[in-house]
């Protein structure tokens, strides 16, 4: 972790013209509790520059700073490293010409990389005509060196965690405005990389997200469009390649359209159930989803006090809702949740499992004993034990890999990231807090007596301080160190 070789937090393209995005984005979405419960009916709003700006800012925008070298984004990220970039494939967005754009969060603008309608080519790569017929697609890419600089090979997992967490925000904002969205995790990797002008190794595609309802008539057949010609800025003085990261990423790649079709049609038997909607808590208030996103920040200190029941039951229900992704069959999830409950009103301390419904007690234990266990499972980080409860999102990897092949591991990590992002938003909706934590992989499985492997750990509880909300586009809140 050489400070002189630290990766740049933002990618730019030299010479690319920048289109400023609207900065006046008052919170106008539905109440956060209703949104996170999936209770906002779709209204299919017209996508214009303001709605696009809203989607980008509240998922990947800069909301806080601490000096000129430390930036915080709207979504959580392991180590605050944010190994992701977002590209916009614009077809029918009011006020923007069709083309390929790159989101530059530090200036809150779109870099215009290539003109023309790239949706047909993206639809070809995803083997999905709805991509060509949707007004907008956002493509999320991962830059493993940005997180491997600190976490080495383990950082590859962080790319998919962080993508899920970021898209939890995007899904919430879209739902809060009645905008239909769908995530594609199946695509020809090399074709999407080529369209974006990235090499597929130091930067690779992670997810394709269509926004808006597809029109009845799809765009034209793919035509050969020139790739972006603007060179990217260097990521760091001497980026380091990790051979294991490259091998793991390439092991899950799909190389043909037939591969994508077959992978997407894979049947995985016995997946847990997931619902699309849950009941919203009555006392949660009417705070818009955007305001909650601005208040959210990784909680650094928690009080060991009794938490209200809805912080466990509603927050976990909201977090485990169906994810609208091609790889996850409707009404199912790849995850189970092993939950260490410490202090929640009406819930006995102990180890619980949440799968196919509310959490079920597996092993009761004294509060202090559970707190000590949770802290140990989280590499002795105090927040793991100071929380009201700590959720360990797990996946049966034998089941996942049998059905999805090597690419299935990406899907499980991604879905865990979505659940983690939703869980934190739900906690902040109720006026509480949460944070992601590192964990000891095998120890989690052993402690809960499960064959499933831990994908991600999230501590949820009562903050010991009042967090300061982030600022609007172009005016991030400045924090003191």
Regions picked out by a protein language model, each given a short descriptive name:
Residues 427:
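Short surface loop/edge beta-strand patches of beta-sandwich-type extracellular domains
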């Amino acid at each position: 972790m050489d400070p002189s070789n630290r990766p740049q937090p933002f990618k730019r393209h030299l010479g690319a013209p920048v289109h400023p995005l609207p900065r006046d984005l008052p919170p106008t979405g539905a109440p956060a509790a209703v949104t996170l419960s999936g209770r906002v009916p779709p209204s299919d709003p017209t996508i214009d520059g303001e709605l696009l700006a809203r989607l980008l800012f509240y998922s990947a925008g800069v909301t806080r700073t601490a000096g000129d070298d430390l930036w915080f984004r709207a979504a959580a990220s392991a180590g605050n490293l944010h190994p992701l970039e977002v590209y916009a494939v614009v077809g029918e967005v009011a006020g923007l010409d069709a083309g390929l754009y790159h989101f530059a969060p530090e200036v809150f603008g779109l870099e215009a990389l290539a003109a023309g309608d790239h949706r047909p080519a993206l639809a070809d790569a995803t083997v999905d005509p709805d991509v060509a017929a949707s007004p907008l697609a956002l493509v999320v890419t991962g830059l493993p060196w940005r997180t491997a600089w600190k976490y080495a090979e383990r950082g590859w997992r962080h790319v998919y965690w962080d993508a899920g967490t970021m898209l939890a925000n995007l899904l919430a904002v879209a739902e809060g405005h009645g905008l239909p969205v769908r995530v594609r995790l199946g695509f020809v990797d090399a074709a999407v990389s080529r369209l974006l002008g990235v090499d597929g190794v130091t930067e690779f595609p992670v997810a394709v997200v269509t926004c808006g309802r597809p029109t009845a008539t799809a765009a034209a057949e793919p035509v050969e469009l020139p790739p972006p010609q603007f060179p990217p800025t260097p990521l760091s003085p001497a980026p380091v390649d990790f051979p294991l990261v490259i091998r793991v990423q390439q092991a899950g790649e799909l190389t043909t359209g037939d591969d994508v079709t077959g992978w997407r049609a894979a049947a995985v038997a016995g997946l847990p159930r997931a619902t699309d909607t849950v009941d919203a808590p009555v006392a949660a208030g009417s705070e818009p989803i955007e305001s909650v996103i601005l208040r959210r920040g990784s909680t650094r200190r928690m009080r060991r006090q009794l938490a209200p029941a809805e912080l466990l039951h509603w927050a976990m229900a909201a977090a485990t809702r169906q994810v609208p992704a091609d790889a996850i069959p409707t009404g199912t999830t790849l995850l189970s949740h092993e939950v260490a409950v410490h202090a929640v009103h009406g819930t006995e301390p102990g180890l619980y499992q949440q799968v196919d419904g509310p959490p079920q007690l597996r092993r009761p234990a004294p509060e202090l004993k559970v707190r000590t266990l949770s802290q140990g499972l989280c590499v002795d980080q105090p927040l793991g034990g100071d929380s009201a409860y700590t959720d360990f999102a797990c996946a049966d990897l034998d089941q996942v890999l049998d059905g999805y092949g090597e690419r299935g591991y990406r899907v499980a990590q991604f879905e865990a990231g979505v659940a983690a992002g939703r869980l934190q938003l739900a906690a902040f909706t109720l006026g509480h807090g949460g944070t992601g934590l590192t964990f000891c992989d095998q120890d989690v499985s052993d402690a809960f007596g499960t064959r499933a492997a831990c994908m991600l750990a999230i501590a949820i509880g009562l903050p010991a301080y009042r967090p300061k909300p982030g600022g609007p586009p172009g005016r991030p809140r400045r924090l003191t160190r």
